[in-house]
């Protein structure tokens, strides 16, 4: 995305504080929390393709509103639409990939394929980072105009998708009882619940750090044009971690493949809170590696526990928990950053993720032998 390397600067240019920025993102997360699981159920019942088309249209409209907005209220309206739109996409994309591989009897390749998909997305974002940084020198808003056009291209792509027979043949019906049953079964299954919970904590921590990178670079005196280059390197590290996730998981084994990302995020946050600014870039890379490694590894293990007719809904529950955690940690850490310092905000976030990570990891390790 062209906007991400400089989005915090864009917010500040339009009068938002760090607390405002974190609150805005928390409200976006709240929109995802509200719509995420119902839209996942929509994907499981109406179809993956239809869900992706709806999400693409809504996201295009959301970015269009963003490009015309100049205040917190305008940005909030855009974020609500984007939250609604993205809820149709998140979970559905991974479910579509897994069901396609399942139909071809290649589901064992999911971690590698998901890693490649994540890597491709991050390599694309890395390239966009350089371009976004260059464009931002002339105008921060211009990135939003161009981004709207790029997102619009996803609509014809979504329309061209062929639904896998694995899902088409199921033809489940939309019922409130069926929806509630999936929720209840997920939360009453300890191995699956703790797997999702641990993954959600890790993803929430890597989501939170994204909003600290640009302010950290700003107080370090980094030139604006370098923001895009740094963003590019960070996304390349995510892509590289995603590509190597399958091999690294096989080397580490199941237990340590769960422990590694938790160690990385805790080390990264606390080191950023106490160490010299010159080491910040290496520490950000550490956290971004955790992000790239986690998605394919945990998503594969979650997929192994659930049937196709529940897949998108359960994967959406993971996103719901991720955003719920961010809704709490994000705004509070932003408020602390405004009132005290950026490092103090990072320390609060790190302490929160240490506590949540330890609890969820302990639960996961307790039940790991019952996972498929």
Spans of features found by a protein language model:
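Conserved MFS/SLC helix-loop-helix module at the cytosolic interface between two early adjacent transmembrane helices
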Residues: 33-70
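Helix-to-loop junctions at the C-terminal end of transmembrane segments
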Residues: 34-47, 136, 240-254, 337-338
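Cytoplasmic helix-loop-helix junction between adjacent transmembrane helices
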Residues: 80-122
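Helix-loop junctions on the cytosolic side of multi-pass membrane transporters
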Residues: 140-143, 147-174, 362-372
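Juxtamembrane intracellular "pre-TM" segments in multi-pass secondary transporters
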Residues: 162-197
